[in-house]
UniProtKB/Swiss-Prot annotation:
Range annotated as the organelle transit peptide: 1-37
Pfam families: LIAS_N (PF16881), Radical_SAM (PF04055)
Residues that, per the record, bind [4Fe-4S] cluster 1: 150, 155, 161, 396
Domain Radical SAM core residues, every copy: 164-385
Enzyme Commission number(s) from the entry: 2.8.1.8
Residues engaged in binding [4Fe-4S] cluster 2: 181, 185, 188
SMART domains named among the record's database cross-references: Elp3
Gene Ontology, cellular component aspect: mitochondrion
Gene source species: Paracoccidioides lutzii (strain ATCC MYA-826 / Pb01)
Protein name (database record): Lipoyl synthase, mitochondrial
Pathway assigned to this chain's UniProt record: Protein modification; protein lipoylation via endogenous pathway; protein N(6)-(lipoyl)lysine from octanoyl-[acyl-carrier-protein]: step 2/2
Catalysed reactions, as listed in the record: [[Fe-S] cluster scaffold protein carrying a second [4Fe-4S](2+) cluster] + N(6)-octanoyl-L-lysyl-[protein] + 2 oxidized [2Fe-2S]-[ferredoxin] + 2 S-adenosyl-L-methionine + 4 H(+) = [[Fe-S] cluster scaffold protein] + N(6)-[(R)-dihydrolipoyl]-L-lysyl-[protein] + 4 Fe(3+) + 2 hydrogen sulfide + 2 5'-deoxyadenosine + 2 L-methionine + 2 reduced [2Fe-2S]-[ferredoxin]
Length: 439
């Protein structure tokens, strides 16, 4: 009590002393009476000193800056503006060809450092994957520790291939030997390393289990390049093919392989392992190959691989794919198709190159859909059994698989519906391509 009384007397004395001072010497203190977190400053919200609030930008607290940033995001374009069917435009209204094929540009980047980029054309926009089949396939892949090129290569068709309305309509391309490649092609987003993880000895069995579980009629398997292995992984691929055929003997199997460093014996080993379609991509024309693919991959080596596969098993369907939009010329494409026909390649596909990330080579041009249609007609006229050609077509795109499945079933002596029928000669297959009737 005595201490409290002394404290009160001290405070009273200090107050009396300050009150006796002249007004000019008494310090003036401005106290903030409230806290505001709005993104706009109110006149009665003293965030800053009133002496300079009229001629300077208010200083925002960290929480206010976060709120302001969120408001800007909310006021900007929504996610639907970046996928097909989104935004305020009506996709059902037909466009004039000039307007439909015109490429629009946009400025992106921070103030003072904005760059002009070409926006993705409308014909290259795809929906976001979200379907029961998509979730089921993804769950099975994770449970069995398997990888797909659909995910690793960021394929734009993943929602279409994985999201089929039924098991027979859904397709996934299994990627063997891990998710890390020893090569670094300038167009590919698959991870790369000189020393990738060792092969999974359980992968052949797990792959066979997954494919038999899905109940698909046509399956594509691809693989990374493994130059760190003596055989390039050819024996691992061949074993996987045999395991799949044991668990699902009626399944039609396509393998998209590497070049095995030019070892044609390994190519023959895979070609005769029991698969139905041997695919190896030349990717681009010969003149652009050194700038597009890894230095260990050459155009002539790819031709030798395709030729060796056909020689090892003449009834095998061979297939390759070419990307457009890299700067190739019409004359170069003609020469490429001639070279492919010279080694008896049966199927060719054309697709638009789409830059996966800023670290990869830039797109030279977005090729119009009518140009893809033109190249399809030319390829069929040259004698290819089938040609899938379009901006979103990829080497394992299921539109091509449906036709190849029909051809293979007829060669086996089945009808297109599996009911049975006479075997198909090459002339019958060509008649199928032309839309005729096979007798």
């Amino acid at each position: 009590m005595v201490a409290s009384a002394r404290g009160l007397r001290t405070l009273h004395s200090a107050h009396s002393s300050i009150s006796a001072l002249p007004a000019s010497t008494v310090p003036r203190l401005q106290l903030a009476v409230s806290r505001c977190y709005a993104t706009t400053t109110s006149p009665d919200c003293p965030i800053t000193n009133s002496s300079n609030s009229s001629n300077s930008t208010p200083t925002l607290t960290p929480k206010q800056r976060i709120t302001a940033f969120k408001d800007k995001l909310n006021a900007g374009p929504s996610f639907s503006d970046f996928v097909s069917g989104g935004g305020a435009s009506n996709d059902s209204v037909p466009l004039d060809p000039t307007e439909a094929y015109s490429l629009k540009t946009a400025l992106v980047g921070p103030p003072g450092k904005k760059k002009q980029i070409i926006r993705l054309p409308s014909w290259l926009k795809t929906p976001i994957p979200d379907s029961p089949n998509f979730r089921r396939i993804k769950s099975d892949l994770r449970g069995l520790n398997l990888h797909t090129v659909c995910e690793e290569a960021r394929c734009p068709n993943i929602s279409d291939c994985w999201g089929g309305s039924s098991k027979s309509a859904a397709t996934a391309t299994i990627m063997l030997m891990g998710d890390t490649c020893t090569r670094g092609c300038r167009f590919c987003s698959v991870k790369t390393s000189r020393t990738p993880p060792p092969l999974d000895p359980h992968e052949p069995e797990n792959t066979a289990e997954a494919l038999s579980r899905w109940g698909l009629g046509y399956v594509v398997m691809t693989s990374v390049d493994r130059d760190d292995l003596a055989d390039g992984g050819a024996r691992h691929v061949a074993e996987t093919v045999r395991k799949v055929k044991q668990k699902a003997p009626n399944i039609l199997l396509e393998c998209l392989t590497g070049d095995y460093a030019g070892d044609l014996e390994m190519v023959a080993l895979v070609a005769t392992s029991g698969l139905d379609v041997f695919a190896h991509n030349v990717e681009t024309v010969e003149a652009l190959t050194p700038f597009v693919r890894d230095r260990r991959a050459t155009f002539q080596q790819s031709l030798r691989v395709l030729k060796a596969a056909k020689e090892a098993k003449p009834e095998l369907i061979t297939k390759t794919s070419i990307m457009l939009g890299l700067g190739e010329t019409e004359a170069q494409l003609w020469e490429t198709l001639k070279a492919l026909r010279a080694v008896d390649v049966d199927v060719v596909t054309f697709g638009q190159y789409m830059r996966p990330t800023k670290r990869h080579m830039a797109v030279h041009e977005y090729v119009r859909p009518d140009v893809f249609d033109s190249w399809k007609e030319r390829a069929l006229e040259m004698g290819f059994l089938y040609c899938a050609s379009g901006p979103l077509v990829r080497s394992s795109y299921k539109a091509g698989e449906a036709f190849i499945e029909n051809v293979l079933k007829k060669r086996r002596g089945e009808g297109a519906d599996g009911s049975g029928g006479s075997s198909t000669r090459r002339e019958d297959v060509e008649r199928l391509v032309a839309g005729g009737v096979v007798r």
